[in-house]
Amino acid sequence: MHADPGIEVSLAKGFFITFEGGEGTGKSTQMRLLAEALSARGYRVLTTREPGGSVGAEAVRHVLLSGAAESFGVRMEAILFAAARSDHVEEVIRPALEQGTIVLCDRFMDSSRVYQGVTGNLEPAFVETLERVAVNGVIPDCTIIFDLPASVGLERARRRAANDSPDRFEKEQLETHEKRREAFLDIAAADPERCRVVDANRPPTAIAAEVLSLVEALLPLEGKPQPSNAEATS
């Protein structure tokens, strides 16, 4: 898709949107569809992911998702996630936001709260301290939490992994995935100004339409598409 040549979009500062939820909720697909829709409207968009997103963070991603870091224990894993996030924020996310870009990120700080905090049984104060250091003031303007029964999401993830090796999180038991679903919903309930919950148990096109609608309503007024100078004076 291409931007309408009669539309110019300018953001005084960037807008940071994170995509959260359990395994198999379709986050990555929805992030791609939103990026395409916003780009077609003339916005500058960057898509990224965690763990990873920068050169340093991608190196850590392999260690974390392969299971190679499991022997270190959950506390050390949380530190590795935080180190990857810090590099990602400073090398990719913050510079893009400073240039007026809409940044879409597949997982961010809420995943650490859920995966390392709730189901990793780390004390909240430790998780919060790591988060504060890692994000260094870069907080999402909007977090979209894709909600799906854990059994459905896990089955989707396993089908997706049929032609690939499932990562260590996809191998975990249903009970663990159910706890994570509830934890994400708890985060949304505690921070309704930032978080929006979207029913992910629907066709992708229906979900994408809802996501685009809610994001367009949240974008700052100075970033709304306006007629170009040529159109305004015609």
UniProtKB/Swiss-Prot annotation:
ATP binds at G21, G22, E23, G24, T25, G26, K27, S28. The keyword Coiled coil does not apply. The keyword Transferase applies. Its EC number is 2.7.4.9. One of its GO terms (cellular component) is cytosol. Keywords: ATP-binding, Kinase, Nucleotide biosynthesis, Nucleotide-binding, Transferase. Coiled coil: none annotated. It is an enzyme of class 2 (transferase). It catalyses: dTMP + ATP = dTDP + ADP. SUPFAM superfamilies: P-loop containing nucleoside triphosphate hydrolases. GO terms for biological process: dTDP biosynthetic process; dTTP biosynthetic process; dUDP biosynthetic process. GO terms for molecular function: ATP binding; dTMP kinase activity. Phosphorylation of dTMP to form dTDP in both de novo and salvage pathways of dTTP synthesis. Belongs to the thymidylate kinase family. This is Thymidylate kinase. It comes from Rhizobium meliloti (strain 1021).
